[in-house]
Amino acid sequence: MSKQQRRKGNAKNASSASAHGYLAQGGENFVGLTPEMNIFEMASSNRLSNFSGIDDETRIVMRKLTKKDCQTREKGLRELTNIIAETSSIENCYEHFCGLVPQLSTDGSPTVRLLTMKTITLFLVKLEKSACKGLKKIIPMVLFARCDVTNGVAAAAGAVIRDGFEADKKQKVIQLFAPLVFEMAAKIVQGKHDLSVPVEYDASEDREARKSRLETQSLNVFLSYIKEFGADSTIWEEEARKLFENIAFLKMVFGGTNAALKVQVLNLAYRFKNNVEVILNTPSIVTYIQNHLDSQTFTPECSTAWEGMIILLPSAQFHTKVSLQNGIYPRFLNVIRKKGNHWRVLQHFLLPAVVLLLKEMGSLENNMKVLGTIMESFTDNLPWPTDASINAVLSWFNAFSDFVRWILTNDRINLVVWEKLHPLIVTVTEQAMTFPTKEIAECVTDLLQWIIELKTINEADVSTLLLNIESKIVGAGTENSRLIKHLLTEPGKNIVLSNLHANLLSSPELVDFQIIKNLSCSENDYFNATSQKISNFSFIEKTENFDITQAGDIVRLIKLLLENQEIKSLNISVKNDHVGRRLLLTGGSTIWNKLLKNVPVSTFQNMINYWHEKRNGTAIADAVSFLKEMGVEMDTKQAAENVEFLITLLRKMKSTDVSNEAEKNVLILKLFTAIFESDEDAKSEHYNCLSEHLTSDFNSGQFFEKLFASSEEYDIERILETACRVDKLIDLCEEQTRQNIVNNVLLSGKQCGTIIEQFQFLELEVMSCSTKPTVISTTHQHCYSHLDEHKAKEIVTESARIALFNISSKCECFFLISHEQFFFSDYNSAHQVFGWQVISIISALEKRYSLVALTEELQRSRREIEERLIRSDEVRFKLDDSSPCIFLADAYDMSFEQKKKYIQCQAEPSKVPEHALEVLYRENQTPLDFLMNVFEGGYQMFDFDRSKNYHWMINLMFVKKCIQYGGSIFVAEESGLRDYALCGIVTVLDIHKRSTLQQSTDILGNTPNAFDEDPRLEALTTLFIELYLVLNDSIKNDNHPTQTIEEWKEFYVPTINSLFIRMFRMIRKEQQPTPFVRTLLKAMFTLVEFPTNVPNDSVVTREFVPELSVFKYSLLEESFIAQAFILLSSNVEHVQLIGYAAAKLLVPIMFKTENPQVLDDDQDETEIMVANRSKLNLPVMISKSYPVDHIHKHVGPLLLSLAILPLETTKEFVLNQEQRVAYCDAIDSFFKNALNALMLDQPFDFSQVPIVCKIRKQMYFFQFRYSSHFFTAKSQEREYYLQSDLTASPLFFEKFASRLLFKSITLLPAAVRLFHKNIPNNFKPIFQEVVTKHASKLLIENELNKVQNAEFGEVLKVRTVPVTGQIISEYTVEDTKMKLTIELPRDYPLSVPAMNLDKAIVKGDRAKKWLLQLNAYLFHQNGAILEGIEMWKRNVDKGIEGAEDCTICMMTVHQQTNQLPKVKCKQCKNRFHSNCLVSSFHTYKWFESSNQSTCPLCRNNFT
């Protein structure tokens, strides 16, 4: 193949099919080879030389069956099965396949043999009668394969006969072809058949393996046929007898090492009718049998040998060849004396063989002697080897037991042999105690029990035997004799063993619990016989030795012993142990009088305390009741909450006297409490018992309200489970008392109202924040008592638990099936109303404390309550009350009539004309319709009489409708409406006492408690601030006319912003986050700068700050600064943020006031001189306010945000480079502490892990949750790090911390780098990971964008490479470019950028100075990349400023060296390039061309 042909894409895979195609194309031109030839087919060439009548595809498949590789043969068989299934004419294929069956069915691959059988089955099934002509070839091989050593092949061969022939012909087929199979099998075994030699192409196994496999399979042919058809069938004998006539074959078998083959030959010999003759005619078989009677292998050689011995022993022919007395009998003795694995076989064959031996040996006397010797041989060579098989040992014991039983049941020999058996039994028993297996011990003890029950041996001999065994037990020790002792003393044993049992109990070194238990469980006769013989009762007197599982049996035995009048020496001391406690529970007069009567009461009390710890109330009740009957009173206070204890006491109360009713009621209430306070659900019998004792006057004492009044987080599932428990209990109560019990257990309507009353302070949230304009309560004119966050959440959580519990109970509703509707009782409707109110209260609470997420319990409580609420007529009726609850009106959708009635109720309809009131509830009016009706109706608006509810109502609804209408006010057709609404904002927010109307309040004067005096004023103010914010957002985001925007910004914004600043002064440090506080916070965040139009009247500094007095602050400024930083230390986060927002506006004033001289100086920005650097100061209130403790966790980060404000380039702050460096130095120490607080002191889940972990967790959460949605991890990074989100939400401080961290690494990269270097090592990798993964890439992107968007002039061209983070600056002078490369690392700013300067056009030391200066600015002085490039450009500009052209080359920068003219003439002061004067590589060679070393201009000599 040429090189072109070998190119990629031209190569093809080698395959048999490809080779066949090439050979077919070439015919016989390739040295006589054709597609039909194969070098591996030589062994089958005669059979396969001509495939006539089959197509090419089938021919190829048939050829595969003769391939050398077994995988190819397997593939060919599978393809052949497909052809058989898909092709209709397969006779020719079948004919050719039959010739291959002998080789394939004996193939070395089991898979090939298996597939061959399956293929034969397919042929037979499909061809049916047409397959008859090939049966003679294939059926013998199938029958042969039925005995294959591989089970799968044998099963497949059996399936051929089963599926290929009808049921009545199967046996005939086998009988017909069996002689052929036997003939083939015999030849294969003798090595005379062609199949016994592997064909040349079969490489699956070697010659020996194939020979062994086929020999085994051939002998199995005979044995399996005999097993299937019985030994009576003799058609197999002719061929089998040839095997035993072949002396060479037998010598080969028994002289070889194939044990399985020997066993098969022996088994075949045993199946002949004249088997003894066949065996004796083969001397090697007789020798083999005698030699393998004690074979230790795990093959069946030993059992086969004994089977042959059993056949030979009765034969007289065998006796003539082998002496029983001198040959077989000694051999038997040797086999018995030997202790090995052969005993597993001897157990089954020894006794029959010995019986036959004794029968053939003759006289009784001789037999007794032989039998005695055989029995003595059992105990020879003891003990057994330690490595002996336990199965073999057990077989030895079983064999000995069988011999003993046979001997003792034989009247002729039992008494004669007993004298020898007695010591042997003792020895065997002693040997059994050396093996810790129950089977061996059972074998021996069963034999002893059988001997005792047989009664053949007299009692004296039996007693002697037992005494000898007892002595062996004593000698063996406690552990070795354990099993024997337990089994000999088991219940149900013969009374003869009672003496042994008593002796064991009386011996402390031999007794154990099982022996004691056996006595306690024995029958009366055995127990009495044994107990009377016990001489020492110490085994039971030490009761502390028994555990709780043994105590029951011990107490039963003690009770039996106490009832036995003949036992006097029992001395038991009752203690607080398991036995003592069980004795107390057992009770009874006998135990009390003999054991418990004199026990100290303290012992009984300790028992009760123990049961209390184990929560065993039943035991406590039983014990207390028994002791009470005996006149002993016990303290049971600890068990008062135990359900079992209480139930048991109730059941034991037999008397129903009035004197016991009080005690009974107390127990019932305790049981009620215990069931519902338990972590686990009570049992059914507990509920049944409680329901039996509950009456209609049962009083739970507000149990569930107290149960749920817990400050800890409560599992919602527990509440629902408690409701289910109540349902279970109520269902079991009687119908006449059920409803009364429900009323006493669940919350009443009056109680619900009492709970709601404590949430009046949250009504302000509904009035101010509800999206339903009609939900306005103006009836509450008293001062609200605002709770702090902790207390408010606590009582709301408790109320939510109670509401969920009450509405979760199914017993609150009754069904009217005929109408398919719910009907509620008064209690149920009260619970539903209470549920509606609670979800409104939870929402109001969520709005109030918006910076902190609701607890998981409250969130889930709200969901669970909402799922169970039902909108029903009964609940709607509650809205028709004269004073409906504002929470219910907020949560429930009111109808038009209800809205009308609600408004009429609030607006004092008796004093308001109906036509004037109609505007408030008119149906189907849009917000614009309402505003126009009010605008044209002449109502008192904005500055109104505060004593009239109606005026409050119209103003509150007006502002809510304005908020709904939003920015559309600016484009309203009626321009008067726009001015009316906008002026109303200013009017309401700037209400003074100068108003002539009655009861007007000045909220901006010196009355900071104005809102507390009238909450309606706070709601109104809040709504108008909200309206301003809505309109302000509309101006920013919507398209409005230019005139409208200018009017808004020039008139309304300055005026209202000034009002906001004045409102800020009335915020108190301890003030709760009411709607006004939260809305003012939003308004403060919208302010860009401190208003200049704030009036300076009546300003009183709330706190004197000495640090501020040294600066030239105005009284107004000092007052606001002090107020802002006072609020920063508040415990209320919203108030903290208001202080922060105000301080943020005041920082520019503070910075300029406290650094006046430095900021006024006009510094040179070319170089930053450390020695002469001006000093700037951090505003003193920022450093002074830094907390010394961790109480105010957010103050540190908030102050850090204020401290770095001067570094941000804004209208208020424009610092040059030197001033930036000076300010960075000033805040260095503060920055370290504040950044540490930012990282470590945030109130998140990780108390001792940096906040960055929270940031990282948040990023991973979003990345996982929104990976396939709109929100991606990247967008979340930008949201957290780049966007300044000041929305008051639970994520506020997380986002604030993330943004502040990003600003810190942007403005103070060097300081952050130093901080990272010094933080503890366990935090360092986490900080590194977060900054690298999230912040660095955004920071690098920002830096590159800044540089990319900057303008540097014509001489400096800057480009960025975002992929590598490179910034390449090229400074061009004439045709020469000097290049500065800055590469930002991936973890910038934690690692420093790499810088490189190429083609410097100034001296090397000056270029290095520029780089060092840039390095110092970026690495140590918190310089930005853009500013560093600008500084480097200024240095280069200054370096080449005033540089003149070289008059030789007329260029400023040398084209080759990129240097400025440096060589100076002392006379004319002109400068030249050194290369222009002397270089030999340049066109200009002045010294050489002029042949002198003079100046080209003044001719002065340079030398």
From Swiss-Prot:
The keyword Metal-binding applies. Its EC number is 2.3.2.27. Keywords: Cytoplasm, Metal-binding, Repeat, Transferase, Ubl conjugation pathway, Zinc, Zinc-finger. The keyword Repeat applies. InterPro entries: ARM-like, LTN1/Rkr1, LTN1_HEAT_5th, LTN1_UBC, RING-CH-C4HC3_LTN1, Znf_RING, Znf_RING/FYVE/PHD. GO terms for biological process: protein ubiquitination; rescue of stalled ribosome; ribosome-associated ubiquitin-dependent protein catabolic process. A zinc finger (RING-type) spans 1446-1499. It is found in: Cytoplasm, Cytosol. One of its GO terms (cellular component) is RQC complex. Pfam families: LTN1_E3_ligase_5th, UBC_like. Its main location: cytoplasm. HEAT repeats lie at residues 52-89, 93-129, 133-170, 280-318, 323-345, 346-384, 552-589, 640-663, 664-700, 845-882, 1022-1065, 1078-1117, 1141-1183, 1302-1340. Pathway: Protein modification; protein ubiquitination. It catalyses: S-ubiquitinyl-[E2 ubiquitin-conjugating enzyme]-L-cysteine + [acceptor protein]-L-lysine = [E2 ubiquitin-conjugating enzyme]-L-cysteine + N(6)-ubiquitinyl-[acceptor protein]-L-lysine. It comes from the Eukaryota. One of its GO terms (molecular function) is zinc ion binding. Belongs to the LTN1 family. E3 ubiquitin-protein ligase. Component of the ribosome quality control complex (RQC), a ribosome-associated complex that mediates ubiquitination and extraction of incompletely synthesized nascent chains for proteasomal degradation. Ubiquitination leads to vcp/p97 recruitment for extraction and degradation of the incomplete translation product. Component of the ribosome quality control complex (RQC), composed of at least the E3 ubiquitin ligase ltn1 and nemf. The complex probably also contains tcf25 as well as vcp/p97 and its ubiquitin-binding cofactors. RQC forms a stable complex with 60S ribosomal subunits. This is E3 ubiquitin-protein ligase listerin. The lineage of its organism: Eukaryota, Metazoa, Ecdysozoa, Nematoda, Chromadorea.
